[in-house]
Amino acid sequence: MYLYRVFFLASLWTAPLFAAATEPDTSHQSKKWQIWAYSTAAPSFIGDSATVLDQNNDVLRQGTNGWTCMPGNARPMPQTGWDDAHQAMPVCADVESLKWMQAYLTETIPQLNRDGFMWMLHGDLGEDNTTPMVMHQADSTDGHWIESGPHLMLMPKDPQTIAGHTTDFRTGAPYLMFAGSPYAHLMIPVEGYYQYSTAP
């Protein structure tokens, strides 16, 4: 099973980034724009059939495949809407990684039935790779702030199963974020990952 997971992750890591649907020319506060922005955090074969939630967890579109797409930015949405999809930090999560996200936001221990996966093809605004819940680069550990482009995340049922991976995010290889904490997970860069930071 472990070797299967390694080969599966390797195939994702080397695959090209899937083309997102065309951004609608409408207000970023609109239901149509939000559905586009959040659902394109995953490849279309996942995002097109996923449930889409807004920042208040209200359903914008009911899905059919068990995945949920929503903004991942914990900061309040501006009155005029997010500037772009990157600022919204949207995620598309399966059932298990959604449990992980809820535990992370409530500072409780994730209780998963299996490993979970979460897509973020629009990237994020930055994280301290060593410490959870650091919102600003000025508060981060020196040299450990990374603003990510497109990536996939593996949220492990047991963090020890990924403990042997590097924490170095500068190599282009999958790496550990929040190592040693209950929120340790594997970051898997895909094409475009370093568009907001220095490439290897």
Where are these predicted regions, by residue range?
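Sec-dependent signal peptide recognition
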Residues: 2-12
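Primary mode marks residue(s) on the alpha4-beta5-alpha5 output face of response regulator receiver
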Residues: 22-200
